[in-house]
């Protein structure tokens, strides 16, 4: 359903799929079946604006550009960094972009495995992730890649939303957040709501590798007409 009803229209028509029947599914907290952690977050308030807050139609006043790197403390002149601040046009990274990203930053980047053994528990796994991230930042790392790609029958994933939120809060508590970017490489993110939730809770960029792999499989079946794969991803 995610591929056919959500991702396919976004790649083919460059817009989110719309529906008119409303959402009558139970709230995630009341559901008897598994629901992703993203479903537990709901928007409490919406503001209608005219003109719309839209990075495409109103690009003079609205942008999705994302800064990353060692931002330092902009209020402390003694702490201003001389390092370059890099900018992306979007916080969503394709699979090829994340590979270039990793190669570009080299030793200034660390990849943190956000999976854990069945012999561990979730709390211990999160504490381990927080400790690794703090040590890395104190040693001068400017890019954290949080990944759940090592998921297997023997290794369970820490929900990426928990991983990002825990590290973001932990680094803020220790006054280290401004020195590093948090980049989420996750197979959980399948729609704009999950992207927005990750970014809202502290991620700098998101690489939805599983969603992109799914779209590539549909592209190989020639389900996107005359569009090439890169064009579908950009759309």
Predicted segments, located by residue:
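Conserved structured catalytic cores and adjacent interaction surfaces
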Residues: 108, 119-124, 128-194, 200-201
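Flexible loop/turn segments at secondary-structure boundaries
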Residues: 48, 61-64, 68-73, 118-121, ...
């Amino acid at each position: 359903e995610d591929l056919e009803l959500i991702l396919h229209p976004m790649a083919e028509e460059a817009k989110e799929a719309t529906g008119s029947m409303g959402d009558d599914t139970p709230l995630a907290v009341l559901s008897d079946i598994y629901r992703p952690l993203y479903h537990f977050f709901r928007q409490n308030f919406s503001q209608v604006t005219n003109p719309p807050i839209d990075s495409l139609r109103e690009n003079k006043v609205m942008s999705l550009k994302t800064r990353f790197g060692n931002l330092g403390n902009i209020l402390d002149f003694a702490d201003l960094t001389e390092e370059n601040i890099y900018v992306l046009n979007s916080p969503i990274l394709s699979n090829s972009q994340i590979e270039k990203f990793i190669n570009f930053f080299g030793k200034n980047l660390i990849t943190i495995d956000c999976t854990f053994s069945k012999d561990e528990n979730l709390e211990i796994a999160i504490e381990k992730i927080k400790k690794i991230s703090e040590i890395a930042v104190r040693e001068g790392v400017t890019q954290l890649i949080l990944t759940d790609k090592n998921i297997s029958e023997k290794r369970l994933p820490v929900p990426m939303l928990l991983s990002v939120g825990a590290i973001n809060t932990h680094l803020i508590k220790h006054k280290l957040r401004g020195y590093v970017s948090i980049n989420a490489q996750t197979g959980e993110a399948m729609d704009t709501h999950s992207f927005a939730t990750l970014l809202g809770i502290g991620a700098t960029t998101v690489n939805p590798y599983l969603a992109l792999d799914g779209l590539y499989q549909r592209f190989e079946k020639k389900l996107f007409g005359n569009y090439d794969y890169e064009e579908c991803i950009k759309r």
